[in-house]
């Protein structure tokens, strides 16, 4: 016992050694206090083994080694004869980790940070680490302006040397900026400078960017904004001397003072480009031209550097170094730009790889590549491949990396990392309006069938007035050169009278095929043939309908009022279709920049029962207002025109319509434009030699049924904004926009007669009867499929128009 006490004293006070100069030989090692840690694991962590001769240094190393495992709070080493006794106190095991009071920081983020610090369920608790964790979390709150915040770790002991760990947060309130002072500005007012900041001491109601809540990171960004503002206006000697952030005694107010030196404005005296230009000096000099007397501009200097890097990157110089050293002449207030360029090595591409395409086949991605293996690297070609993959619409995100090949000086591998989205959808649409009630439609579409890139779809509608089924198939790479082949088969039974359209029934079916030919990266042409059969019956006498029938030589007999004509009409038509498409959108879903446009034409070829042509145009352009693409303006234009050939008219069943979620939101589908003007022939005239509807009066009591027209124009403008309360993780899956829609449909062949004027029928030949609506839309690419909601209120409407304020579509995705 005396030996044990003496050994403890020597370890604690290091005043003497009990082992003598030669130490002693360890015959056995015995542990006391082990519970969770196995004896074998403890022995492996020690530098001492049975049979070793040890001294004071070995004992010290043993204690340090055991502490280094992180499993023990206390370690003592004692000697009992030739047995080494190791007494330990294990750190308690964490049984649970909980949080309380944290509103600004999510539990998942806290757990992730704690685990990075070694604090997780099932691990030993290091009490010393809790202090630094508390301080680190409090520092985070201070950085976002919550200076009264506190974080306390509460450890509750449990049986079997376990503990519950609970972090208790008292967040407090964010300190608000009371005043921002700028000292040293002469050329520009403080108000003008502060107006460019995110942090503000005053925020008007319309400013959705400004913030009075102090955040250290935002202040750093505002200081950089201030620096760039002056450097872009020629103040080459501008400097921020100091920044003071003062806190009020109650920790609820912040005063910010920025001390700066403006200096004088400097002009550019010239640009000198030196170094290894890889034989592209003429092109580089063209990128660095400046006008005589031009003010120094920091942003322009940065742009020059980036342009030089992009230029060299196009020729395979993947890692050029471009450094600009401004040579400032204070005497004449000029700056000479010395641009040093080192193009570095030129690289070949060894492999182009794809990662993350679990469904899509490699060939589907590889055929979109413009950067070839074995060729010189071209950064523009690599980026072009990324854009083309994004444009497919198969992927939620596409990233690209260029990595050097180890041990090879002039080769790189290009890897595209994709995150696939669900491209198969079973969807149905629902609409609700005060006049229309509820309507439904359904469809199945797989845009990347079995990962082949082929599109297969079947869509259908079944309701009170329509039974419609369509099967479609498109192979975008029917040939290796990118010629596409598409086809469709459809069947449609349509009872227009039940759809608030003019009275008739049409049973139609058809088949069609289209070939597409790429012209360049963004343009393509297509040509196709269609066959369509239409079987019309139950046609109620109506002005534009009877005008068409008369043009094709069908003259129904006159019947009395409230009796439908017994006239039937069948048409077999063959159409030649041609079209042009342009697309340079940055991605297929939720684009932020670029334009998509298409123009199409179809004409009935000889041998058809009808003779007419139809033209359509559709264009949508996106203009980002911010570099992040969170604020975007979108404009869309749709137009159409159709006309008969010779004395023939356009079939009334192939008219243009507008209204609904795809054209003018806020209006019921297809209800904008000309309405039916039904003939109402008196019964006493029928059968008395009266054989023409032209002399019958018009029923002025029933003019609400839409008939469409042969011309259409629809305009839309949308402001796409960041969706509130959505984290950056889901920002690419949700889109919110405010919109204004406008559109009209008219009949260029309409002529008012004495009877139509008497009945008060409007002039349906006018193109100026524009309908307008405004509202808000929300689109969400949810795990269950695409969800689209819109609420719109008609701003300008006409008699007979039918509103449908709330519309949404719901889809199920596999």
Swiss-Prot record:
Which key words are in the record?
Cell outer membrane, Membrane, Repeat, Signal, Transmembrane, Transmembrane beta strand
Checking Pfam families in the record gives: Omp85, POTRA
The subunit structure is:
Part of the Bam complex, which is composed of the outer membrane protein BamA, and four lipoproteins BamB, BamC, BamD and BamE.
| The organism of origin for this protein | Pectobacterium atrosepticum (strain SCRI 1043 / ATCC BAA-672)
Report the protein name in the record.
Outer membrane protein assembly factor BamA
Q: Which domain of life is it from?
A: Bacteria
The Gene Ontology biological process annotation of the record reads:
Gram-negative-bacterium-type cell outer membrane assembly; protein insertion into membrane
PANTHER family with a match to the protein in the record: OUTER MEMBRANE PROTEIN ASSEMBLY FACTOR BAMA, SORTING AND ASSEMBLY MACHINERY SAMM50 PROTEIN FAMILY MEMBER
The record, for Gene3D superfamilies, names: membrane protein fhac (3.10.20.310), membrane protein fhac: a member of the omp85/tpsb transporter family (2.40.160.50)
Annotated signal peptide: 1-20
Q: Name the lineage.
A: Bacteria, Pseudomonadati, Pseudomonadota, Gammaproteobacteria, Enterobacterales
Q: Where in the cell is it found?
A: Cell outer membrane
């Amino acid at each position: 016992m005396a030996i044990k006490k003496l050994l403890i004293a020597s370890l604690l006070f290091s005043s003497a050694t009990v082992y003598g100069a030669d130490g002693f030989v360890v015959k056995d090692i015995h542990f006391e206090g082990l519970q969770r840690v196995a004896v074998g694991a403890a022995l492996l962590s020690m530098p001492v083994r049975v049979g070793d001769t040890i001294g004071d240094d070995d004992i010290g190393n043993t204690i340090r080694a055991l502490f280094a495992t992180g499993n023990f709070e206390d370690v003592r080493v004692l000697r009992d004869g030739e047995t080494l006794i190791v007494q330990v106190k294990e750190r308690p095991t964490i049984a649970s980790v909980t949080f309380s009071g944290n509103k600004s920081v999510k539990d998942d983020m806290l757990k992730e940070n704690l685990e990075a610090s070694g604090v997780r369920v099932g691990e030993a608790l290091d009490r010393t680490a809790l202090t630094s964790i508390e301080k680190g979390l409090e520092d985070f709150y201070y950085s976002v302006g919550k200076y009264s915040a506190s974080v306390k770790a509460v450890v509750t002991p449990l049986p079997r040397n376990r503990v519950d760990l609970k972090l208790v947060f008292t967040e407090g309130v964010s300190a608000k900026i009371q005043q921002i002072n700028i000292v040293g500005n002469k050329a520009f007012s403080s108000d003008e400078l502060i107006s460019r900041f995110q942090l503000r001491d005053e925020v008007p109601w319309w400013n959705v960017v400004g913030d009075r809540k102090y955040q250290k990171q935002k202040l750093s960004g505002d200081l950089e904004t201030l620096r760039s503002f002056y450097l872009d206006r020629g103040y080459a000697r501008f400097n921020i001397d100091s920044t003071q952030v003062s806190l009020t005694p109650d920790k609820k107010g912040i005063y910010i003072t920025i001390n700066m030196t403006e200096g004088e404005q400097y002009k550019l005296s010239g640009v000198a480009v030196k170094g290894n230009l890889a034989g592209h000096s003429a092109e580089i000099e063209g990128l660095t031209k400046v006008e005589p007397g031009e003010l120094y501009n920091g942003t322009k200097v940065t742009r020059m550097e980036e342009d030089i890097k992009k230029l060299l990157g196009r020729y395979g110089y993947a890692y050029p170094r471009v450094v600009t050293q401004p040579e400032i002449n204070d005497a004449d207030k000029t700056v000479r730009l010395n641009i040093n360029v080192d193009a570095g090595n030129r690289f070949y591409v060894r492999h182009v790889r794809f990662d993350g395409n679990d469904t899509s086949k490699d060939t589907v991605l590889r055929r979109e590549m413009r950067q070839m293996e074995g060729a010189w690297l071209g950064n523009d070609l690599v980026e072009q491949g990324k854009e083309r993959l994004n444009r497919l619409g198969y992927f939620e995100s596409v990233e690209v990396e260029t990595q050097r090949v180890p041990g090879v000086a002039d080769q790189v591998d290009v890897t595209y990392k994709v995150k696939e989205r669900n491209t198969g959808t079973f969807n149905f649409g629902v609409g609700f309006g005060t006049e229309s009630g509820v309507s439904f439609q359904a469809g199945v579409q797989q845009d990347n069938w079995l990962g082949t890139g082929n599109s297969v779809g079947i869509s259908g509608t079944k309701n009170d007035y329509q039974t419609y089924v369509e099967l479609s198939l498109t192979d975008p790479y029917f040939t290796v050169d990118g010629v596409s082949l598409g086809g469709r088969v459809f069947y449609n039974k349509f009872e227009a009278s039940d759809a608030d359209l003019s009275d008739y029934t049409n049973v139609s079916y058809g088949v069609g095929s289209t070939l597409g030919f790429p012209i360049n990266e963004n343009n393509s042409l297509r040509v196709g043939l269609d066959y369509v059969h239409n079987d019309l019956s139950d046609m109620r006498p109506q002005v534009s309908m009877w005008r068409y029938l008369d043009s094709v030589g069908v003259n129904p007999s006159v019947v009395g009022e409230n009796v439908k004509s017994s006239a039937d009409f069948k048409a077999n038509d063959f159409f030649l279709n041609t079209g042009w498409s342009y697309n340079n959108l940055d991605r297929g879903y939720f684009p932020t920049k670029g334009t998509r446009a298409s123009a199409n034409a179809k004409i009935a070829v000889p041998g058809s029962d009808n003779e007419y042509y139809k033209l359509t145009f559709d264009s949508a352009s996106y203009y980002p207002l911010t570099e992040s693409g969170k604020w975007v303006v979108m404009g869309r234009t749709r137009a159409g025109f159709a006309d008969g050939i010779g004395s023939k008219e356009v079939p009334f069943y192939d008219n243009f319509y507008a209204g609904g979620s795809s054209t003018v939101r806020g209006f019921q589908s297809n209800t904008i434009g000309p309405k039916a003007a039904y003939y109402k022939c008196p019964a006493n005239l029928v059968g008395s030699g009266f054989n023409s509807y032209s002399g019958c009066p018009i029923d002025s009591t029933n003019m609400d049924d839409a008939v469409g027209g042969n011309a259409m124009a629809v305009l839309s403008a949308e402001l796409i904004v960041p969706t509130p309360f959505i984290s950056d993780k889901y920002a690419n899956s949700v889109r919110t926009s405010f919109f204004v829609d406008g559109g009209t449909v008219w009949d260029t062949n309409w002529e008012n007669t004495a009877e139509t004027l008497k009945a008060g029928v409007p002039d349906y030949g006018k193109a100026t009867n524009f309908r307008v609506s405004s509202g808000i839309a929300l689109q969400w690419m949810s795990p269950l499929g695409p969800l689209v909601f819109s609420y719109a209120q008609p701003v300008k409407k006409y008699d007979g128009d039918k509103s449908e304020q709330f519309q949404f579509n719901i889809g199920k995705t596999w």
